[in-house]
Amino acid sequence: MNEKLPISIAQITDIHLLASESQRLQGISTTESFLAVMKRLEELRPELDLLLMTGDLSDDGTPESYENLQHYLNSLQIATYWLPGNHDCAIAMDKILNLGMVSRRKSFQRGNWNFILLNSSVTDCVYGYLSATTLDWLDSELKMLPNNPTLIALHHPPLSVNSAWIDRSCLQNSQELFAVIDRYPQVKLVLFGHIHQEFRRQRHNVHYLGSPSTCYQFQSQSTTFAINQELPGFRLLKLYADGTWTTKIERVPYSLPIEPTVTVSY
C-alpha cells in the first residue's frame, strides 16, 4: 500500500462535438453521448483531481463546438487540460478553452507526477506527426522538470493497433518520439486517443494506453472501417507518488442505436 494518496485522473477523448447540438454523427448525437459521460464524471467528481482531454474534442473545428464544450466543463469544476486532434482547430481551442478550471497549458505538475501534452495534429491531414520543434520541446521539458514519474499524452497512437485502416493514420514519426522517451526512464505512461477503443501495450518500461471514445467505437483488429455497439467510455487512472499506477475503463449507458451505414471518420 502506498503511503501517499494517488492522483486520480479521468481521460476523455474523441468527443466529436459539432457546431449544432442537434447534429448527428454516425447516427448518434455526440452531444448526448458526451453528456452521458459528463453525468458519470459528476458522480466521480469528489474523487477526481484532473481531467485530460486527448483530442478530437470537436468534429468540425468550429468555435461554436468549443464554446459548447467550455460551457459543459464549467459545471464540472475539475482541473482540465487538453490537446488537439486531427479534427480540431488548435487556434480556436487556444482562444476558447482557457477559462475557469480549463487550461491550455501543456506542461504541468500534480502531486509527484509531471504531465506533458503534445500536439500531433497536422493541418488537413488525418495522420499524426510530431514536428522537430515539438520533439525538441519535449526533450527540454524532460531535462528541466524534476526527475519524477512522467505522463505524456498526444492524440495519435505511436504504436500499431493491429487495425490496418487505423494504422495508416497513426503517428508517422514514432521512432523519433521513442528516441526522446528512451533517454528518460522517468517516463512511465503515454496516453492517446484517435482509435476509439481500449488499447494497452508496453514498450521497454513505458506503457502506452489508448482509450474509447465518448461517442462511437471502432471495431478492434478490423482491416476496414467498422463501428461496433460498445458503449461510450473513458479511462480512469490512479497515479502513485512512487511511479506505480492503476487504470480501468468506464462505460456509460447510451441507448440510441448507431446507423448501420456509415462513412469513414477518424
UniProtKB/Swiss-Prot annotation:
Q: Which Pfam families match?
A: Metallophos
Q: What is its EC number?
A: 3.1.4.17
Q: Which InterPro entries match?
A: Calcineurin-like_PHP_ApaH, CNP_phosphodiesterase-III, GpdQ/CpdA-like, Metallo-depent_PP-like
According to its UniProt record, which cofactors does this protein need?
Fe(2+); Mn(2+)
Q: What class of enzyme is it?
A: hydrolase
Q: Which residues form a coiled coil?
A: none
* Residues noted as binding Fe cation 1 in the record, renumbered to the chain: D14, H16, D56, H196
Task: Enumerate the catalysed reactions.
Answer: a nucleoside 3',5'-cyclic phosphate + H2O = a nucleoside 5'-phosphate + H(+); 3',5'-cyclic AMP + H2O = AMP + H(+); 3',5'-cyclic GMP + H2O = GMP + H(+)
Regulation of activity is described as: Activated by iron and manganese.
Q: What are the binding positions for Fe cation 2 in this chain?
A: D56, N86, H155, H194
A molecular function annotated in GO for this UniProt entry is: 3',5'-cyclic-AMP phosphodiesterase activity
Q: How is the cofactor bound?
A: Binds 2 Fe(2+) ions per subunit.
Chain positions recorded as AMP binding sites:
H16, D56, N86, H87, H196
Q: Alphabetically list the UniProt keywords.
A: cAMP, cGMP, Hydrolase, Iron, Metal-binding, Nucleotide-binding
- Give the record's family classification: Belongs to the cyclic nucleotide phosphodiesterase class-III family.
- Please give the function described in this protein's UniProt entry: Hydrolyzes cAMP to 5'-AMP. Plays an important regulatory role in modulating the intracellular concentration of cAMP, thereby influencing cAMP-dependent processes. Can also hydrolyze cGMP.
What is the name of the protein in this document? 3',5'-cyclic-nucleotide phosphodiesterase alr5338
